[in-house]
């Protein structure tokens, strides 16, 4: 059933990702397409963010991106609602000796006003659909301006309401997956490690509309528009030549219409005036 109260849905999401935290890196760290997605997001950010800046990361997970940015010389305050993910992140940060560059805090992105470390920051960053786990994205977005330096950035990686690859799965008889984004205004059920919670889809226009008073758009890119989504497992390994061709096409067309709007995700960046 969809439509759980926001705080209840948040508790379900926390439980799901805490369950997944101990196996998260084993599940995803070796996946070729996930590696491609991470590189695309990081390259996008590095185009705009000045070296040595400070980052507030939302839904930071086990800290893969926080570690990357630490190695690039950025300071990151990594937040998450999942106790399990925060524990994995702390262990990883200690292992790599970057405690001086990565701090962490257990905090919901719907309650950023409660942050102990309020910055201000040069970038607020949310990767890989973390923000799709709330039906209160408007509340999250409204808190951004006060946490940023003048000229600070927001970069979000979000699932839109339409994905070309996903819709094409109808031809494989996967009707539930093919149409799951079409009737999702009240949320669609997601299932992670034995726990169900509601997932919501947002187009770039939703974010632009709610931030337009204080932010300018820097860019929107489609992600896994031509390259298959990572849940089509093993594609890159089974079809290396096709994968290489598709990545080349996507890299060329990522910021063009309609490709920037029909991927599994989109990357959107905005700058505070």
Give the location of each predicted region.
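Acceptor-substrate binding/catalytic loop of class I
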Residues: 190-206
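A C-terminal cap/extension of S-adenosyl-L-methionine-dependent methyltransferases
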Residues: 209, 218-273
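A short SAM/SAH-binding and catalytic strip from SAM-dependent methyltransferases
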Residues: 123-136
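A short glycine-rich, Lys/Arg-flanked "PGG" loop and its adjoining helix->strand segment in the class I
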Residues: 138-153
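Class I SAM-dependent methyltransferase SAM/SAH-binding core
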Residues: 62-112
């Amino acid at each position: 059933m969809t439509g759980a109260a926001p705080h209840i849905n948040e508790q379900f999401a926390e439980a799901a990702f805490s369950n997944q935290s101990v196996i998260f890196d084993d599940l995803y760290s070796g996946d070729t397409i996930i590696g491609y997605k991470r590189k695309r997001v990081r390259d996008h950010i590095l185009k705009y963010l000045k070296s040595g800046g400070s980052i507030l990361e939302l839904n930071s997970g086990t800290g893969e991106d926080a570690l990357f940015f630490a190695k690039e010389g950025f300071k990151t305050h990594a937040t998450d609602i999942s106790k399990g993910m925060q524990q994995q992140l702390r262990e990883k940060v200690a292992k790599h000796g970057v405690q001086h560059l990565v701090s962490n805090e257990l905090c919901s992105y719907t309650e950023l006003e409660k942050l102990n470390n309020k910055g201000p920051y040069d970038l607020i960053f949310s990767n890989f659909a973390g923000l799709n786990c709330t039906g209160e994205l408007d509340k999250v977005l409204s808190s951004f301006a006060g946490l940023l330096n003048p000229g600070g950035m927001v970069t979000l990686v979000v699932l839109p309401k339409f994905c070309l690859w996903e819709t094409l799965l109808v031809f494989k008889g996967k009707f539930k997956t093919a149409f799951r984004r079409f009737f999702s205004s009240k949320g669609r059920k997601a299932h992670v490690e034995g726990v169900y919670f509601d997932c919501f889809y947002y187009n770039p226009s939703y974010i632009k509309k709610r931030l337009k008073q204080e932010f300018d758009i820097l860019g929107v890119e489609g992600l896994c528009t031509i390259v298959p989504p990572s849940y089509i497992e093993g594609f890159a390994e089974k079809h290396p030549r096709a994968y290489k061709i598709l990545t080349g096409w996507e890299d060329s067309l990522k910021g063009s219409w309609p490709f920037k709007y029909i991927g599994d995700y989109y990357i959107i960046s905005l700058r505070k005036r």
